[in-house]
Amino acid sequence: MGSQNSSLDLRRVGVHAWSWFTLASTFLLLCSGGIVTSKGVGMSVPDWPTTYGYNMFLFPISGWVGGIFYEHAHRLIASGVGLLTMILAAWLLAVEPRRWVKNLGVIAFVAVCVQGLLGGLRVSLFKDEIGIFHALLAQSFFCLLGIITIATSPKFFRGGWDVFIPDPVLKKLALLSTVLIFVQLALGATMRHEHAGLAIPDFPLAYGEILPDTAPTALDAINTKRLADDIVPTSAAQIWIQMAHRGVAIGIFLAVVSVALRAFRNLVARRALVWSCIWLLMIFCQVLLGAWTIWSNKAADVATIHMALGALSLFLGVIFCFRLHRGIQAGRFCVPDTQTARDFSSIA
């Protein structure tokens, strides 16, 4: 019996370690994709699934130059993540006793297959719209792997994620913040793939105003000046997409501040306070990076870091919501002591 338990524990540790490896590789893939988009080299390799007629895995290293290097490396990393995910899904089906975790593994495998197809279609059909969906699915897939990694951890098995946190309002605020971040990432992906990142070249104002004038005559004047400064013309739609991006950024910051304040008032949820403070710091840094992206004339490295921190902000939001959900569910199986109930009633 002891040897069976030891073998089971070893398998659990193994699948958890593999989950971590897959998660880290996926983050590397996200950063790689961000570099490709930031540098505008997504079409450096115009064919798919081949690379200039070669089998993707046999393309000679001598051809890895310029933009081809970034796009081809992105494809190879993506292939590796696909293989890692396939093994992870099969491993979960083989050893995981919980059906919902098995299902997450299958969903992850389907998602990575669809993601690869979207990446190929983005090249084959040369459609920016596909690139936007490709970016959003990548973010969602990353978060899904995070849930799988947590669910396979020894701490999760021991009930460490089921500590009673009796605050549904905190969960709703965290969920609202996370949804806003996803909307923000959608706007960011649209800006990146529609090349609207510098539709407004100044910050915090927009063409010297709080709200830019995009009437036809004003837009003509804007584009005349942009052409004089050797900047490609823009459109009213691109300008307002960036304004929406800025507006949602303010909404996210205020929402995460409300999460931190709510956690601070809940004496029972000290763990939630640490999470929310880290989250707030990430959002603050993200706002600074967004400003720096504009001030640096959308430097590729700054824009990529901005994208990567956005992915981590969404990731933390999803994991935080999952943590709060488990904490509230734990209330079905335990009754808080009198002091805990009194502490909660003071903020409810």
What are these regions (language model features)?
Residues M1-R12:
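Short, Lys/Arg-rich, polar N-terminal cytosolic tail immediately upstream
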Residues L92-V106, P168, A260-W279, A341-D343:
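Membrane-interface helix-loop-helix junctions at transmembrane boundaries of multi-pass membrane enzymes
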Residues I147-I165, V169, L173, F315-A348:
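A juxtamembrane structural motif centered on a specific transmembrane helix
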Residues T37-H72, G197-Q238:
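Extracytosolic (periplasmic/ER-lumenal) interhelical loops and adjacent juxtamembrane/interface segments
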Residues V36-V45, C113-L136, M191-P201, V287-A311:
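Interfacial helix-loop-helix junctions of multi-pass membrane proteins
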Residues I68-I87, E129-C143, W240-S258, A303-L312:
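Membrane-interface loop-to-helix entry segments
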Residues V15-G42, L180-R192:
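N-terminal signal-anchor transmembrane alpha helix
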Residues A24-S32, N103-R122, L176-Q184, V274-W292:
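Small-polar-interrupted transmembrane alpha-helices in polytopic inner-membrane proteins
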